[in-house]
């Protein structure tokens, strides 16, 4: 089988792109490579900075680090306060500014920023973020943020101390509030290979993806490195690499079904059961015991003109009620529908179902993973 992709820069890409369009027709259960994997090295980067928000209507703060930051800012503008002077900065707040720098961001482009108070400011509504340097993990400045905040929350305090707070007034956003000043180097144009990393690791999916790329480009063009990574040979010329990647990431293939899992959120009572979960033969009974303790206070009153004292004696009444639990039996190969139907028949609450699932897992009756989050 001949290679469908030409690595000669003097040849055009019409043939391979036509082949890509012809092979893009897929079944309803197929997925594109771009939907289940991402290109290694093509990633976003987190930025963070410390700054000041000014213009607050008395909802700012006057903490030591805010005053220090405010004085340092004035010194940068050539303003020197007299020694011992403590400015009243109730219209200023110290904030942390965060942003996400998308891959391939260029100088002059803008990104959104999130501004959050780090002191005792009551609200950032109506404030303006002053020029703040956003740095990466390497300590270099990649963007500069500044602008008016949009705050969805609100806060109001009455003269008697009563207070009403809606949403979160100490966090705001600035759309396009940071301008990119430095580009992050990308390994996209280097090397002879492009590596795709699956969003969910699976050996079968990785092998099927490599086979689909080989069927599209030719034999030995792609190989599964492990359960996450698939390496694809790519043109060295950067002008061909973009078109090459555009064709490859739109190749359709059938990912493997996920492993059998039961996800239990113990805080909210949410239970999600995968379609491949099955149960081995088991019998389950689940009952409840209610203990009610009622305190009755008995008062002993001494007679008139006596030296006795009034004594209060507690009288406890304990009542135990045990509900009769129903027993239900799981036959071999029980599916999700059967499990839900059986639990509903006994009227089990979500908390009861969690206890049942944990007991079944301990008994080895669940074919799958039980994950409690």
Swiss-Prot record:
<dbReference type="GO" id="GO:0005198">
    <property type="term" value="F:structural molecule activity"/>
</dbReference>
<comment type="similarity">
    <text>Belongs to the FlgI family.</text>
</comment>
<keyword id="KW-0732">Signal</keyword>
<comment type="subunit">
    <text>The basal body constitutes a major portion of the flagellar organelle and consists of four rings (L,P,S, and M) mounted on a central rod.</text>
</comment>
<dbReference type="GO" id="GO:0009428">
    <property type="term" value="C:bacterial-type flagellum basal body, distal rod, P ring"/>
</dbReference>
<protein>
    <recommendedName>
        <fullName>Flagellar P-ring protein</fullName>
    </recommendedName>
</protein>
<dbReference type="GO" id="GO:0030288">
    <property type="term" value="C:outer membrane-bounded periplasmic space"/>
</dbReference>
<dbReference type="Pfam" id="PF02119">
    <property type="entry name" value="FlgI"/>
</dbReference>
<comment type="function">
    <text>Assembles around the rod to form the L-ring and probably protects the motor/basal body from shearing forces during rotation.</text>
</comment>
<dbReference type="GO" id="GO:0071973">
    <property type="term" value="P:bacterial-type flagellum-dependent cell motility"/>
</dbReference>
<feature type="signal peptide">
    <location>
        <begin position="1"/>
        <end position="30"/>
    </location>
</feature>
<keyword id="KW-0574">Periplasm</keyword>
<keyword id="KW-0975">Bacterial flagellum</keyword>
<dbReference type="InterPro" id="IPR001782">
    <property type="entry name" value="Flag_FlgI"/>
</dbReference>
